Amino acid sequence: MANAWEDPIYRGLLAKASEATDGKVDKLCIGCHTPMGLTTDSVSAQGADKVHIAGIGCDDCHSMSASTGTGNGSYVLTPKKYGRSLKFGPRDDATSPYHDTAYSELHTQSEFCSTCHNVTHPFNRLPVERTYDEWRDSPYASADIQCQDCHMTPEPGVTKNPGKAAIMGPEREHVYSHRFTGANVTLHKHFGQDEMAERALKLLQSAAEMEFLSVPESLQAGESASVGLRVTNVGAGHKLPTGFPEGREVWIDLKVTDYTGAEVYRLGAVKDGHTEPGTKNFKATLGDSDGNVVEFAVWEADRVLSDTRILPMGYSDANYEFVIPTDAEGPFTITADLNYWGFAQSTLDKIVGENKIKSEIAKMATISHVVPVSDLRAQTK
């Protein structure tokens, strides 16, 4: 969150969006990437910032007193009351010598996050991002598991974090972690934040599981084969993946190798900076008024062309058909990797310039199965 304004990918997109819309989207975008920058009029979509300013900081969240709805920056900031600084938070017994304090139930609810994690197209009302709605309609909401319960813990699966919220504060049974772990491995790596990149990877790896549904009992050269896979969203309280659709992609990279390790079949490789045609991926794709795919220019989108993302606690199956080459020798190993990136490298190059930022591929899960040969021609190697 601290990188929300300095994110060069976002800044590149914002500059393009501002130019294309004659500045009409500037305040909408800036409002959720640096509320302080918006309210002080100290930043510019074109990069001419008046001061160096952070993205989402302490004052932004703890000045929020209410929301006017969901999405598009629908927050209300009350940094002062009766001429005194005021901070809101989840404790009804909080005190501070530096400012007044007020209890806010909103800070414990997903509705707090909804103010920016639903995004609606400002011109045609297209639902561009619906992370909050995805959670609201999920079993997690029914079980009273809030966004904060996953993204404000020390690591996946840790529900209690005892300690002090401030140096002079009392010991608490649970203190919310303010690392705000998400899935942006690429940005953390770009900024040299290796620890945060590792946290992001752990969160991704806790989100999904993969299993074989069917594999051949045996194989031989020249034989047809089929493989069935299932990917289950076991840990994300929203669709997998979620967020802006111009880049977020999860996909299966399936490889079959012979006894030497040489590939005899593959589908799901990255070629020319994007996943190859036919790849089983999980992604939302937007389109313009003519039905053309919108790669990253969200301001041109007016429809959702497809959405293959996996629902919370849902699953998606994939089936593969292939033929083993006639000169291949077994045994054969089938390996499936479940990968994620925030942007395809080819898209990233168009936004920030070629080879400026490397799009990190995060391996979320991997499974493999060895298939023996099925005839007497096989040799033990």
Identify the function of each model-found stretch:
Residues A2-A17, S44-E300, S306-P312, N319-I324, ...:
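Primarily the internal scaffold of c-type cytochrome electron-transfer domains
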Residues G23:
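Local sequence-structure signature of Cys/Sec-based thiol-disulfide redox active-site neighborhoods
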Residues D26, G31-V43:
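Conserved, well-structured interaction surfaces
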Residues G330-I334:
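Exposed beta-strand face motif in extracellular beta-rich ectodomains
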